[in-house]
Amino acid sequence: MLKAFIRSKNPMFGILMHVALGFACTVVRDVFMLWFLVFSFTSFGFITTGSKKVKLINVIYFISYMSSMSLLARMTKAYNYKLPWEFGKYVIFFGAIYLILALNARRGLLGLLMFFLLIPAMFFGGDRDVQWHDIVFNLLGPISVCFAIIAFTKTNITKQQFRQLLKMVLYPAISVLAYVVIKTPDFDEINFQLGANFSTTGGYGSNQVSTILGVGLF
């Protein structure tokens, strides 16, 4: 599936697919999990074959798409299927680990220094013990950044590859937009107030939804 999106010369193919995905998720939330599984399994061969340089850029495409799609996963409550709440961070983490171990992408030693500086925070939590969920919620993001720095430092991409990368970030935003548009009630039914209004964000946090829609608009 990732291969089809990358090699398609007509961007309307990916746009319409993700509009349909957003609409479908408003009817049956389980559609997202089906899409997640189909996309993951059909993309596995694409990101694990070819030369080292080809695999590197394909993994970058995969990480960009999946990390952006993590918001729709939360909105559709994919955690009911044991998909981790922070699965976007897991994708970045394991994607970077794969590149470091399998492709020997180890040029950003600054990331290694950052990781070692984060280690004390895994064991010392001030006035309480550090639990696993504390590490995942607070540290998995920075740790993923550390390993991404190690894996992606000095990676050169062409203008065409950069455009493809932007498409991979944009497609999930289109699905979120479609989902929010359908879920938003008529203005007459909205109770406007000073705080965040979940009725206009598909029932999810306004910060996250506005962020990904802002990225898509930009």
Segments (PLM) and residue ranges:
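Membrane-interfacial loop-to-transmembrane alpha-helix junctions, especially the N-terminal start
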Residues: 10-12, 49-63, 102-115, 161-169
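Juxtamembrane membrane-water interface segments that cap and precede transmembrane helices
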Residues: 14-20, 72-73, 188-202
